Amino acid sequence: MQHSKSYRKAAAAIDRSKLYTPAEAVKLAKETTSVKFDATVEVAMRLGVDPRKADQMVRGTVNLPHGTGKTARVIVFAAGAKAEEAVAAGADEVGTDELVARIQGGWLEFDAAIATPDQMAKIGRIARILGPRGLMPNPKTGTVTMNVAKAVSDIKGGKIAFRVDKHSNLHLIIGKASFSEAQLVDNYAAVLDEVLRAKPSAAKGKYLKKVTLTTTMGPGVPVDPNVVKNLQEGSAEG
């Protein structure tokens, strides 16, 4: 793969043999973004789990203190009073059978889906579409609920879901390059806290194997996975 001159210049600023503290990594990621738009900042984590085993699945949600920099488009499967609550809370689309039909027809212009429990049988018809994209409502992530208003406002406010993929990796957005270093470190700390909290008891050996911070089309910055406390100061205490 041929990288651009700006990418190669950015990559040269990163010492591949070093593990950076979160504060250092955020600073470098912001400095090495080479695109002309406001790049997305993402953290990738390699976990010491076998996701093929049910007792080693890692999933959960995290409330990013400063959001993702993007307002999520949220749809809600609900009827009656619950549908009205969802609309009032700011849901982008609300419906039942007609929403299912639109998705069956190929419409996927949303970032999160919420459902009341009574709608789950209908949503089963589109599980094959939503599941692989991480969009299937699930009680564990608070997206199958009677409290649709809270679920909508949480997601709009920066709550994101995470789930380990079949290669034992997690990918989470922690903001935009335009965020301050402190905001990105705060969001990273929130993500790290929830991922550590989600560690399965069946997981043996080193849990957090590798952490990399990247921006859109930018080089990866290796982060020390052992730095948990004092993130702003970059202390290596864990």
Swiss-Prot record:
Presence of keyword Membrane: no
Transmembrane segments: none
InterPro entries associated with the record: Ribosom_uL1_bac-type (IPR005878), Ribosomal_uL1 (IPR002143), Ribosomal_uL1-like (IPR023674), Ribosomal_uL1/biogenesis (IPR028364), Ribosomal_uL1_3-a/b-sand (IPR016095), Ribosomal_uL1_CS (IPR023673)
Biological process annotations from GO: regulation of translation; translation
One Gene Ontology cellular component: large ribosomal subunit
Keyword Repressor assigned: yes
SUPFAM superfamilies: Ribosomal protein L1
GO MF annotation terms: rRNA binding; structural constituent of ribosome; tRNA binding
PROSITE patterns on file: RIBOSOMAL_L1
Record's keyword terms, sorted: Repressor, Ribonucleoprotein, Ribosomal protein, RNA-binding, rRNA-binding, Translation regulation, tRNA-binding
Quaternary data: Part of the 50S ribosomal subunit.
PANTHER family: 54S RIBOSOMAL PROTEIN L1, MITOCHONDRIAL, LARGE RIBOSOMAL SUBUNIT PROTEIN UL1M
Entry-linked HAMAP family: Ribosomal_uL1_B (MF_01318_B)
Family: Belongs to the universal ribosomal protein uL1 family.
Function: Binds directly to 23S rRNA. The L1 stalk is quite mobile in the ribosome, and is involved in E site tRNA release.
Protein name per its UniProtKB record: Large ribosomal subunit protein uL1
Source organism of the structure: Salinispora arenicola (strain CNS-205)
